[in-house]
Amino acid sequence: MGQDTLLLQTHFGTVRDARPSDTDSIVQMVGKLAAHHGDAVTLTPEDLVRDAFGEKPWIHVLVAETDGELIGYAALCGLIQLQFGVRGLDMHHLFTEEKIRGRGIGTALVDACKTKAKALSCRYLMVGTHPDNHKAQAFYEALEFMRRDGHPPRFSLRLEN
């Protein structure tokens, strides 16, 4: 999976591939994101280790870090348009700590997701939002994601390799 890969050096610190030692912090952030959406969390550290760091990883997790503290993450899942032989990634989660939102961390995580997708020979990123999350929708559109037809809102970004 390329753990310990630095994807982006930023004004706040770094965005890199998550490592097993990040598990507890990531699980806590997943809980915060779920609470924000009114969801119950059943993810355990063991689940995350299996899915992100196990023998057959199912997801890619990127983390934003400043001064040794994790302040955000993105979780990516594989997609494919098999009839075209085209790979993509779904940005399943994007989260930054509430106290530091609006400082470019989310944008840096999206940029790192693009880098990761290109490294995996993907040609697009997809992301969905809650229908009432207009702030997130505007965020993705500002980053040149294209709104797709359908409900709930979905956005895609073509990547040039």
Could you describe each region identified by the protein language model?
Residues A117-G128:
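Conserved GNAT acetyl-CoA-binding A-motif
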Residues M1-L8:
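Short acidic N-proximal helix/loop "leader" segments that mark the beginning
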Residues R19-D22, E97, N133:
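Acidic/polar helix N-cap motif
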Residues L94-R101:
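A short, internal acetyl-CoA/4′-phosphopantetheine-binding micro-motif in the GNAT/acyltransferase core
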Residues M126-A136, S156-E160:
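Conserved beta-strand-loop-alpha-helix junction that forms the acyl-donor binding cleft
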Residues Q9-G13, D17-S21, S25-V86, H92, ...:
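Acetyl-CoA-dependent GNAT
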